[in-house]
């Protein structure tokens, strides 16, 4: 608990981070996105009205918050402008409260074309990307050929750099993937349309956050996707292209790692995954279908159906280790209502019969393990919207306590519905 708080997903994304960020920003002065792009989909429900944010930090719905998009985020200008316009048409002021790092890499149309062409070429080995150019933009960043927000300050130089990088990428598109080239003239014209707006939002993010810290302002760092999709620590190669873990906060925003005081890990009471990749506890029976239906498990960004399974404490152990989780927020507890029994995966059994309590490092290793479960009685009572832990059925309380015991991490927040007030805060991350 403290002044600087990180909120991130501990599973394969879609854990319910957006709602929790929005809920806790009543005490924050700054909310910072530090990785990912508009492949994220954070769904918020306020007074029954649903808002889906893909790029702008969820704190934008709070008048007291300034929102920052840090250098670790790959920025799609067209997506940003669309989101800004939608928010402003709904009555939320954006332009005077949203700030950008000039080091943000730009996602441009050729990145999207490359992303789609590659997924198509992979066929049945497709990774399951959102097709929004995230990976190719990060590739350009690492290869030091990417264009950044700061390049927009000099359009003559920008045009030269754009010509060079598009010659390179259009060669790939036409000669290797056999698809049409992207028009240089069209891309440059589009950039000129929004360049001045983006420039007007540029600040020195490191300095802004450091001054905020020294004033005693409360700062929240909003993660996107989930720990198990981290480019280094996730189920590689079925991962995203950024560091979704707590270490990404420092590198993706320029904020000193020693100043982070609390890391809140968001976890569903079960597990979901969208797209390809290993998923040891995945259910292919009626229970899995029930979780999908009751949990409305369809991606906020792609609309794809999510795969559903039991809570995986083995994978969670790795998330705790990597992120130094201070406490959990357990979401969608109500989705488990009505089940005769609930299960927690407590180990992975190998082909030789040995049981391990840590996951493999890469996707291939999951082919050799099967989950070992601990079963507990379910509950028939309705927990949707319950606002006090004392009002939960005893079986649900037992399930919560068992997760705490297995993981060694306290559950500080419990969510029983999509709205702000359908939440139990047992220990506030920003509490003094």
From Swiss-Prot:
Mg(2+) binds at residues 14, 41. Its cofactor is Mg(2+). The keyword Metal-binding applies. Its EC number is 6.3.4.4. One of its GO terms (molecular function) is magnesium ion binding. One of its GO terms (cellular component) is cytoplasm. IMP binds at residues 14-17, 39-42, 130, 144, 225, 240, 304. The active site is at 14 (proton acceptor), 42 (proton donor). Keywords: Cytoplasm, GTP-binding, Ligase, Magnesium, Metal-binding, Nucleotide-binding, Purine biosynthesis. It is found in: Cytoplasm. Pathway: Purine metabolism; AMP biosynthesis via de novo pathway; AMP from IMP: step 1/2. One of its GO terms (biological process) is 'de novo' AMP biosynthetic process. Its main location: cytoplasm. It is an enzyme of class 6 (ligase). Coiled coil: none annotated. It holds the Pfam family Adenylsucc_synt. It catalyses: IMP + L-aspartate + GTP = N(6)-(1,2-dicarboxyethyl)-AMP + GDP + phosphate + 2 H(+). Belongs to the adenylosuccinate synthetase family. Homodimer. HAMAP family: Adenylosucc_synth. Plays an important role in the de novo pathway of purine nucleotide biosynthesis. Catalyzes the first committed step in the biosynthesis of AMP from IMP. This is Adenylosuccinate synthetase. It comes from Tolumonas auensis (strain DSM 9187 / NBRC 110442 / TA 4).
